[in-house]
Regions:
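PP2C/PPM-type serine/threonine phosphatase catalytic domain
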Residues: 1-252
């Protein structure tokens, strides 16, 4: 990995105003390949036990496949797709013992030792790439309101507060195979910031607000700030919140 930067990172999770936590988040460092890491967020749905079972299964599947992953020889996009495909199958099997059908979103980024980065997501948990405070790329939700945005019927700002913003067009555990979207960053640079987060976070911020917080604050400070501000803005009816932030800080 490039010696021009050092990596700092943080994860955060809060149940918001819900009675129980169905989000899960993790940042895994590869046991055999220094500089290889996987950041992942899963937002479970399906009652008290169903949603948590689903997001737990995402984390278990991701951990198992990441441990087997060999950066020097394996294909990163294929491994990320496999996480989605295998978690989807197992979540559907757990539906038998859950009081509601378990479902989950997934948003994950993989950083290889050489500095390339691969994304995968399904549902409305998001991935962001900022350089400094400038948004470089973010994922497009698999949601009903996103189809309205795509048609020009509503703006992105209106989508955030739309009453049907929680309707997904696909996710893990649904009847249909989940939609899978992937993205590739050939080379990460100093001052790049990556974030994966559930909708409990991104619903409450503009891209510019998020970019400012991520560029000015350390990952730990940004995690605490975004959770605190999202809690405040949700006015007592907030969703679970989860996020993982990785920042590449210049050594100069």
């Amino acid at each position: 990995m490039s010696k021009g930067y050092r990596i700092t990172a943080s994860t955060g999770i809060h149940k918001g105003d819900r009675d129980y936590q169905q989000d899960q988040v993790n940042l895994l460092s590869h046991s055999r390949s220094p500089g290889c890491m996987l950041g992942i967020v899963a937002d479970g749905m399906g009652g008290r036990s169903g949603g948590r079972k689903a997001s737990d299964q995402v984390m278990l599947t991701a951990k198992q496949l990441f441990e087997r992953y060999a950066p020097e020889s394996d294909d990163a996009p294929s491994m990320l797709r496999q996480i989605i495909e295998e978690a989807h199958i197992v979540i559907k099997l757990t539906a038998i013992s859950a009081e509601q059908e378990p479902h989950s979103t997934l948003a994950a980024f993989l950083i290889n030792p050489q500095g390339d980065c691969h994304w995968v997501h399904t549902g409305d948990s998001r991935l962001y790439h900022f350089h400094g405070s400038k948004l470089i790329h973010k994922t497009i939700d698999h949601s009903y309101v996103q189809t309205l945005v795509d048609k020009g019927a509503i703006s992105e700002e209106e989508a955030n507060s739309h009453p049907q913003s929680n309707i997904l067009m696909g996710c893990l555990g649904a009847e249909q195979a989940p939609p899978i979207a992937q993205h590739f960053i050939p080379k990460l640079r100093p001052d790049d910031v990556l974030m994966a987060c559930s909708d409990g976070i991104w619903h409450h911020f503009s891209n510019s607000e998020m970019g400012s917080a991520l560029s000015m604050l350390s990952p730990r400070e940004a995690t605490e700030f975004l959770i605190q501000k999202a809690r405040s803005r949700s006015r007592g009816i907030g969703d679970n919140l989860s996020l993982v932030i990785v920042k590449l800080e210049s050594l100069d």
